[in-house]
Swiss-Prot record:
The gene is rpsJ. This is Small ribosomal subunit protein uS10. It comes from the Bacteria. Keywords: Ribonucleoprotein, Ribosomal protein. GO terms for cellular component: ribonucleoprotein complex; ribosome. SMART domains: Ribosomal_S10. GO terms for molecular function: structural constituent of ribosome; tRNA binding. Part of the 30S ribosomal subunit. The keyword Disulfide bond does not apply. Gene3D superfamilies: Ribosomal protein S10 domain. Belongs to the universal ribosomal protein uS10 family. The lineage of its organism: Bacteria, Pseudomonadati, Pseudomonadota, Gammaproteobacteria, Pseudomonadales.
Length: 103
């Protein structure tokens, strides 16, 4: 695995949760002797929803909601076998989506 690179993409609605998860991944990778690039923050996606709160009339009565999706990217350069094993055993928070790709 010397010439490969592992790219880890993280998504979450809570920025504190995603920062904690990236910190755990970085500490685990550095402990096993791999070089880490990142975490690189990607643009936050903001989805806005407008809902009428009146059942029939009063078009002016509306509520607006927003969901923010935070994203981070980590590159692990020159991972060792210990790095891959440690990352597989790592238990991250439930609200974080993790995508791993080898390149």
């Amino acid at each position: 695995m010397q010439n490969q690179q592992i790219r880890i993409r993280l998504k979450a609605f809570d920025h504190r949760l995603i920062d904690q998860s990236t910190q755990e991944i970085v500490e685990t990778a550095k402990r096993t002797g791999a070089q880490v690039r990142g975490p690189i923050p990607l643009p936050t996606r903001k989805e806005r929803f407008t809902v009428l709160i009146s059942p029939h009339v009063n078009k002016d009565a509306r509520d607006q909601y927003e969901i923010r999706t935070h994203k981070r990217v980590l590159d692990i350069v020159q991972p060792t076998d210990k790095t891959v094993d440690a990352l597989m055993k790592l238990d991250l928070a439930a609200g974080v989506e993790v995508q791993i790709s080898l390149g």
